[in-house]
Amino acid sequence: MSQLREIQEEITRHEQQLVIARQKLKEAERTVEVDPDDVNKSTLQSRRSAVSTLEDKLAEFKRQLADVISRQKMDEKPVDPTGIELDDHLKERSSLQYGNVLDVNSIDIEEPSGQTADWLKIGSYIIEFALPIILKALHMLSTRGRQTVKENKGTRIRFKDDSSYEDVNGIRRPKHLYVSMPTAQSTMKAEELTPGRFRTIVCGLFPAQIMARNIISPVMGVIGFAFFVKDWADKVKAFLDQKCPFLKAEPRPGQPAGEAEFLSSIRAYLMNRQAVLDETHLPDIDALVELAASGDPTLPDSLENPHAAWVFACAPDRCPPTCIYIAGMAELGAFFAILQDMRNTIMASKTVGTAEEKLKKKSAFYQSYLRRTQSMGIQLDQRIILMYMIEWGNEVVNHFHLGDDMDPELRQLAQALIDQKVKEISNQEPLKI
């Protein structure tokens, strides 16, 4: 009964606040009609926001009130001796007990979770900001990503920096960068920034700046990304000049020297792949690339670009839209995703536990990357990923950070010293280092 009274009091209080807020909104509207300057417009916007927030809270309290009243009515109803709820369609009692009631009022099925992001709007929003706040936010959502998401889950956070501001009648006002931190039940709007979308768009727009500041996500750091991208341009050139296992060009009489070799190279295979990608362009992504090309962003134009691989330095969960139509780029991201799965499989294999516990430690970065990237309108060429793995797989795996770099002899000696000291001071069994 006390809960019902508390909700009723909250409804009364919010209704009073709403009346006052609506009066202030009317006053602000009249002020803007008389003097429509930026300060008055800003005040009007904040008044509208306050009214909207109060209306939402009031509606939520009314829903809670209805739920409490409904629950009380259900409690007052006589219990059916069969144990079946009154509105259950079963004729006989189920072997399962009744569980929680899941309230789906807040879910908007017009904008389902997992929908394709509006990359043009997201990119346009990001490009408006100064580079320092973008890179600092990227650092917080990649290098410190896990902690940032954990501390702010279920909220819409604002990044603030002195480099990001706007002038309103000569008054400097902070310009915040908004990012939503969804929970598993959250529904995201197409133009709404989440940590995954933020990393994706920023990595695609500013790879040269990310390379210059050496911003690398921990999940990329542990697979040896910094080692792998060293001398990237030379590494890719050598790769592209190699013979492609999927092309066979027979020399023809009178053919110029080296033409047959070129036509059977990996470079020729990627040129064919580029021709296929050129036919799959989406207008929104083309518009985003044009918008980015006219400003500060540093989009890679080919796989051989020195900062091309840095598009994936912060582990975006899909290929960034700004380079999705460059042959080999989407596949390079898939290659990195496979490497992450390979490292996690190695780590799971060496841990102690049951087979089921080890399986839980495996990851599915590749499947997630594949699904998200293909939702943007392209199919990945698995042959290119295979060629990457043949060429670089062994080299990268040998540079994985597996968290166990202690020399076996050093470990054995250290353990012997631990065992000896523990026996001297106690009768307990010494732990393993």
Curated annotation (Swiss-Prot):
Site feature (Important for the endonuclease activity) residues: 88, 103
Any one Pfam family match given in the protein's UniProt record, by short name: Hanta_nucleocap
Region described as Viral panhandle binding: spans on this chain: 1-175
Region Interaction with host RPS19, annotated ranges: 150-175
Entry's localization field: Virion; Host cytoplasm, Host perinuclear region; Host Golgi apparatus, Host cis-Golgi network
Location of region: Interaction with glycoprotein N: 80-248
Region of interest (Interaction with host DAXX), ranges: 377-433
Ranges where the record places region RdRP binding: 1-50
Region (Homomultimerization): 1-79, 100-125, 377-425
Region (Viral RNA-binding): 175-217
Motif YxxL: chain residues: 178-181
Coiled-coil blocks: 4-71
Record carries keyword Ribonucleoprotein: yes
SUPFAM superfamilies: Eukaryotic DNA topoisomerase I, dispensable insert domain (SSF46596)
GO cellular component, one term: host cell perinuclear region of cytoplasm
Spans annotated as Interaction with host UBE2I/UBC9: 188-191
Summary of the function given for this chain in its UniProt record: Encapsidates the genome protecting it from nucleases. The encapsidated genomic RNA is termed the nucleocapsid (NC) and serves as template for transcription and replication. The nucleocapsid has a left-handed helical structure. As a trimer, specifically binds and acts as a chaperone to unwind the panhandle structure formed by the viral RNA (vRNA) termini. Involved in the transcription and replication initiation of vRNA by mediating primer annealing. Plays a role in cap snatching by sequestering capped RNAs in P bodies for use by the viral RdRp during transcription initiation.
Domain remark from Swiss-Prot or TrEMBL: The N-terminus is required for chaperone activity and, in trimeric form, this region likely serves in high affinity vRNA panhandle recognition. The N-terminus also contains a coiled coil region, which probably participates in but is insufficient to initiate N trimerization. The YxxL motif is indispensable for the interaction with host MAP1LC3B. The central region is involved in specific RNA-binding. Has distinct cap- and RNA-binding sites so it can bind simultaneously both the vRNA and mRNA cap.
Assembly: Homotrimer. Homomultimer. Homomultimerizes and binds to viral genomic RNA to form the nucleocapsid. Interacts with host MAP1LC3B; this interaction participates to the protection of Gn from virus-triggered autophagy. Interacts with host SNAP29; this interaction participates to the protection of glycoprotein N from virus-triggered autophagy. Interacts (via N-terminus) with host RPS19; this interaction probably mediates the loading of the 40S ribosomal subunit on viral capped mRNA during N-mediated translation initiation. Interacts with the viral RdRp. Interacts with host SUMO1 (via N-terminus).
Protein name, UniProt field: Nucleoprotein
